[in-house]
Amino acid sequence: MLVGLISDTHDHLLNVEKAIKKFNEKDVELVLHAGDYVAPFVIPRFKMLKAKMIGVFGNNDGDRELLKKKFSEHAGWEIRGSFAEIKVGNVKIAMLHGNEEELLNALIENGSFDIVVYGHTHKAEIYRKGETLVVNPGEACGYLTGKSTIALLDIEKLEARIIELT
């Protein structure tokens, strides 16, 4: 099963559409958004997404109630707050935005999760800490690094790769 990972869209509508196109091309079954949508008007742009979507809030997400409402208008979509524990088969995934560095490090270090997904830094990276796969899909917006990225996560292989949106 392929899972799409995205973070830090920051209202960049064109890159949201590029990410959705890539997720649909790759037949992902689930998309995890690690926060910083920013404005609620971004959420309807995800409507062409064929997969289910689970999200968390980021530090720049202002109108959280309206973001929740926009998510609830789509079957199979949910926004869980600041943290989400997701089970895909026997794989446990922790997702948070990552702006609380102590919490992020504790989740990575404690070994309770197979995968930890976060955003916030806008820096795409994939590494292992013990048995835990840690993935930051980078910034979909491309504002800070100049690179617009997402990630694809293979649940069976417990492997991820970064995809640049072009």
Outline where the language-model segments fall:
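Active-site-proximal beta-strand elements of phosphoester/diester hydrolases
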Residues: L2-H10, K92-G98, L133-G138, I162
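Core catalytic region of metal-dependent phosphoesterases/phosphodiesterases
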Residues: L2-K87
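Active-site environment of divalent metal-dependent phosphoester hydrolases
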Residues: H10-N15, V38-F41, D61-L66, E100-N105, ...
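Conserved functional loop/turn residues at catalytic and ligand-binding sites
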Residues: D27, S112, H120
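Short, Asp-centered acidic motifs that coordinate Mg2+ and/or phosphate
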Residues: L30, I93, D114-I115
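Redox-cofactor binding/interface segments in oxidoreductases and associated redox assembly factors
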Residues: L32-H33, L96, Y118
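Short hydrophobic/aromatic-enriched beta-strand-loop microsegments
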Residues: K52-F57, V117, V134-E139
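Binuclear metal-dependent phosphoesterase catalytic core
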Residues: R80-G89, N105-S112, R128-G130, V135-T166
